[in-house]
């Protein structure tokens, strides 16, 4: 079930984020030829329109932080019949990405999802766009193949959260010189899945928000293994599943942050 929180002011303290830094590995790979293996990827697209009175800030990709929380320690009070701790009491790790740029701090959380390997941003006036995605095989990034059963479980269990706050960061942009890499997931019409979890929006600086998530096979078109979810917050009203990710942003204007 989705949880939407709209902040009318910054009265609430920002949510604490875990503290262990996770570095992603990178190695070249290619699409597997095995029939029951799939390179699953994720594509997250977000468009934020800031409030009219918000100062224009075109400094994108000011900083990107990746943090993975450790798996929580099992409850010592809960034991199985053989006196060992039940694995069901261990929460899966969540990876957080904090992107500062364009006068915003965008915090994303990913649990049981495909790995994020590419992060990019663009800004035009009071509009800030961002994209977080996996990278399809053959582009110099590691992309492990998993079974069909594992892919279906990933589609069912993946959860993405977002927390957008105002930022007064003044440091310069740190745009990378390499091209923006992508997931190569098809953007055809597919069924909706409940992927987006909690969404927090600070209306002190955010006027409108459109947010799209798509998961699919990066090497083979398979409607069974491709789903999407969407969220809109426009003019004070929230709605689910209505975002058209094919025309949400102009991807050609994105610049690589990592």
Swiss-Prot record:
Main localization category: secreted
Quaternary organization: Binds to host CC chemokines, such as RANTES/CCL5, MIP-1alpha/CCL3, MCP-1/CCL2 and eotaxin.
Extent of Acidic residues compositional bias: 68-91
Function: Inhibits host immune defense by binding to host chemokines. Binds host CC chemokines (beta chemokines) such as RANTES with high affinity, but not CXC or C chemokines (alpha and gamma chemokines).
Native organism taxonomy: Viruses, Varidnaviria, Bamfordvirae, Nucleocytoviricota, Pokkesviricetes
Primary gene name: OPG001
Subcellular location: Secreted
Family note: Belongs to the orthopoxvirus OPG001 family.
Induction or repression: Expressed in the early phase of the viral replicative cycle.
Highest taxon of source: Viruses
Protein name (record): Chemokine-binding protein
Oxidoreductase as UniProt keyword: no
Signal peptide positions on this chain: 1-17
A Pfam family: Orthopox_35kD
Keywords from the UniProt entry: Early protein, Host-virus interaction, Inhibition of host chemokines by virus, Secreted, Signal, Viral immunoevasion
Region (Disordered) location: 65-93
GO terms for cellular component: extracellular region
């Amino acid at each position: 079930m989705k949880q939407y929180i709209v902040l009318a002011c910054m009265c609430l303290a920002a949510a604490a984020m875990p503290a262990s830094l996770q570095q992603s590995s990178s190695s070249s790979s290619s699409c597997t030829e095995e029939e029951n293996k799939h390179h699953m990827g994720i594509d997250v697209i977000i468009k934020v329109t800031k409030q009219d009175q918000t100062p224009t800030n075109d400094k994108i990709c000011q900083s990107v932080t990746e943090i993975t929380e450790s798996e929580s320690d099992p409850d010592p009070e809960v034991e199985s019949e053989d006196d060992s701790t039940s694995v069901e009491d261990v929460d899966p790790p969540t990876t957080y990405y904090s992107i500062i740029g364009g006068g915003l701090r965008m915090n994303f959380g990913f649990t049981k999802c495909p790995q994020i390997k590419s992060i990019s941003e663009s800004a035009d006036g009071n509009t800030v766009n961002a994209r977080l995605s996996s990278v399809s095989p053959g582009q110099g990034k590691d992309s492990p193949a998993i079974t069909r059963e594992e892919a279906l479980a990933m589609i069912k269990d993946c959860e993405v959260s977002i927390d957008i706050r105002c930022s007064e960061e003044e440091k310069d942009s740190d745009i990378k010189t390499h091209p923006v890499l992508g997931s190569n997931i098809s953007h055809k019409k597919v069924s909706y899945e409940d992927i987006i979890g909690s969404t927090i929006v600070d209306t002190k600086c955010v006027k409108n928000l459109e947010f799209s998530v798509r998961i699919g096979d990066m090497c083979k078109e398979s409607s069974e293994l491709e789903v999407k979810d969407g969220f809109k917050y426009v003019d004070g009203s929230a709605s689910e599943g209505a975002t058209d990710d094919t025309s949400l942003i102009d991807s050609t204007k994105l610049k690589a942050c990592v």
